[in-house]
Amino acid sequence: MKKKVLALAAAITVVAPLQSVAFAHENDGGSKIKIVHRWSAEDKHKEGVNSHLWIVNRAIDIMSRNTTLVKQDRVAQLNEWRTELENGIYAADYENPYYDNSTFASHFYDPDNGKTYIPFAKQAKETGAKYFKLAGESYKNKDMKQAFFYLGLSLHYLGDVNQPMHAANFTNLSYPQGFHSKYENFVDTIKDNYKVTDGNGYWNWKGTNPEEWIHGAAVVAKQDYSGIVNDNTKDWFVKAAVSQEYADKWRAEVTPMTGKRLMDAQRVTAGYIQLWFDTYGDR
């Protein structure tokens, strides 16, 4: 989501200098750095610029391949209500209350302290679980449009904590400023290299409540944080402002761990969707 602008007074003082910086590793004709934090979600229905949607679609593909553990009418329902699901995935980044008045605080969750980056704000674990449960209530009431919209919201928050920066409260204003957004732009260019091609989701991975799953995903993601954000990648990112060589270096450095994260996210998401159906029953 390339428009996640922090509405904090402290952030406002940083926006002006950031806007004047262009990086050697830009692929869009020198567009400026923006204050953003997300897996990308630029278009409701286009995977190329919406890694949240890409992860969910790959998770549904995993479910479709597993005809032993996954009831295929569940896959059929996901496809039947795909528009509502995608609307929920997208709305999390573009509509209130989901994007928290442009602070996006609820899209972050550090599993070590249970908090987001803004004190006392709601975080991704409680927010994702909230919409998981609201989706289930709507499903039981046979309000399918609302059910799958809420499910899309919940999947967005789960997707966020699968990204190590979100699980470590590393925002786009963290040093080096702009690294968060440039990293996620880069992820969009390599994600198709890391499609899961089997039917092995993380079935029954955690307990029976969504909080455990979101927390567990954040724990694993944070363990991988140093493979993406470390002294080398930060130094190279800063130097990439004037050097394509260093842009290539930080990208190469983060690629292996990014691939691991993308594959884990697909499998966790498949299991999480299965948990939702297991919890609230089939239509």
UniProtKB/Swiss-Prot annotation:
GO terms for biological process: killing of cells of another organism. Zn(2+) 3 binds at residues 39, 52, 160. SUPFAM superfamilies: Phospholipase C/P1 nuclease. Residues 25-38 form a propeptide. Pfam families: Zn_dep_PLPC. GO terms for molecular function: phosphatidylcholine phospholipase C activity; zinc ion binding. InterPro entries: PLipase_C/P1_nuclease_dom_sf (IPR008947), PLPC/GPLD1 (IPR029002), Zn_PLipaseC (IPR001531). It catalyses: a 1,2-diacyl-sn-glycero-3-phosphocholine + H2O = phosphocholine + a 1,2-diacyl-sn-glycerol + H(+). It comes from the Bacteria. Its EC number is 3.1.4.3. Residues 39-283 form the Zn-dependent PLC domain. Zn(2+) 2 binds at residues 166, 180, 184. Residues 1-24 form the signal peptide. Its cofactor is Zn(2+). Keywords: Cytolysis, Hemolysis, Hydrolase, Metal-binding, Signal, Zinc, Zymogen. Binds 3 Zn(2+) ions per subunit. Monomer. Required, with sphingomyelinase, to effect target cell lysis (hemolysis). Belongs to the bacterial zinc-metallophospholipase C family. This is Phospholipase C. It comes from Bacillus cereus. The gene is plc.
